């Protein structure tokens, strides 16, 4: 059997080279140049086109090259005989932590304000805050979220974490479910979203939620664009309740040039770069899962189709 690489808007070349290096006896093919669709039982995917996996009748394992799998589950009909695997790697988690720490520091030390003042040659000091002054609340404390929460707590931030189900994380006050959401939001200075996309979490970040963050608070979205009601964020920012937001993910990517988010003075935009898969690190997991698949052994980091993560 062979491995198929099925990517949209991502070059497969380095992946092909890396997999061939680690699996020299395995044929690695790139869609649409597949010799025999019946021979493919393992696919490496990034944003596969709508319904495309149905072309592979013997496909057993669908492996994401990112931590999220919604880019697969939203466009494909997954069979009960198929297993979806996500990519979990400490490098990915650490990259996310570093990005979020930089984003928090930019906000509490007023670096963007000073950059704006520089344009007008305005020499004016701003009041800053320290780590111990700030409560950071994290929506989504799975593998990456829990890693980030522990790291930030170790630096002295007051950290809260929320998930659909209760989690225990060292140094973190944790909350779960709808009943504890308001308690989780109470006292929040910086709200960070790292949730997976599920029917329960789509549009969860709305006017009602953002209005419960402390006045002058800040919002960072590194989860998915589907979590955020963009119009509500703009309204809360315009009201003055929130001081700003940093958005790394969007419902439509790339973000359309005419989108109002581009021109909002209180919104910082980054092009989905908070943490990027390291191919060498990812290859070890893919190779291990492929070999486990061939040998009938359990696969790592499989998706629960009922939970969606």
Model-flagged regions — what are they?
Residues 1-40:
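N-terminal glycine-/charge-rich "phosphate-binding" loop or analogous flexible N-terminal tail
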Residues 28-39, 50-53, 172-187:
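Short acidic low-complexity segments
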Residues 41-115:
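Phosphate/diphosphate ligand-binding glycine-rich loop within oxidoreductases
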Residues 44-45, 64, 192-193, 221, ...:
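Redox-cofactor binding/interface segments in oxidoreductases and associated redox assembly factors
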Residues 87-99, 113, 253-309:
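C-terminal helix-to-coil terminal segments
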Residues 114-147:
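Glycine-rich NAD(P)-binding loop of Rossmann-like domains
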Residues 155-171:
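NAD(P)-binding Rossmann-fold cofactor-contacting core
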Residues 166-260:
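Rossmann-like adenosine-cofactor binding region
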């Amino acid at each position: 059997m062979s491995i198929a690489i099925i990517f949209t808007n991502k070059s497969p070349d380095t992946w092909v080279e890396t997999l061939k290096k680690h699996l020299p006896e395995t044929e690695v093919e790139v869609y649409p140049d597949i010799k025999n669709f019946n021979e493919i039982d393992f696919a490496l995917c990034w944003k596969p086109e709508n319904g495309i996996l149905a072309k592979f009748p013997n496909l057993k394992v669908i492996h994401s090259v990112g931590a999220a799998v919604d880019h697969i589950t939203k466009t494909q009909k997954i069979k009960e005989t198929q297993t979806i695997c996500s990519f979990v790697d400490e490098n990915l988690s650490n990259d996310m932590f570093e990005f979020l720490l930089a984003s928090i520091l930019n906000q509490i030390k007023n670096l963007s304000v000073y950059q704006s003042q520089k344009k007008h040659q305005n020499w004016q000091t701003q009041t800053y805050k320290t780590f111990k002054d700030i409560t950071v609340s994290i929506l989504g404390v799975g593998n990456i979220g829990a890693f980030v929460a522990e790291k930030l707590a170790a630096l002295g931030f007051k950290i809260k974490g929320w998930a659909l189900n209760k989690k225990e994380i060292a140094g973190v006050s944790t909350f779960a479910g709808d009943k504890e959401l308001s308690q989780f939001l109470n006292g929040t200075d910086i709200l960070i979203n790292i949730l997976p996309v599920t029917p329960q979490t789509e549009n969860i970040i709305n006017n009602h939620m953002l209005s419960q963050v402390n006045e002058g608070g800040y919002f960072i979205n590194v989860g998915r664009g589907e979590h955020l009601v963009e119009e509500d964020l703009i309204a809360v920012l315009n009201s003055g309740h929130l001081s700003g937001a940093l958005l790394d993910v969007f419902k439509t990517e790339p973000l359309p040039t005419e989108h109002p988010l581009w021109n909002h003075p209180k919104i910082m935009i980054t092009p989905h770069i908070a943490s990027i898969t390291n191919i060498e690190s990812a290859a070890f997991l893919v190779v291990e899962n492929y070999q486990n698949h061939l040998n009938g052994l359990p696969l790592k980091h499989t998706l629960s189709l009922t939970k969606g993560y």
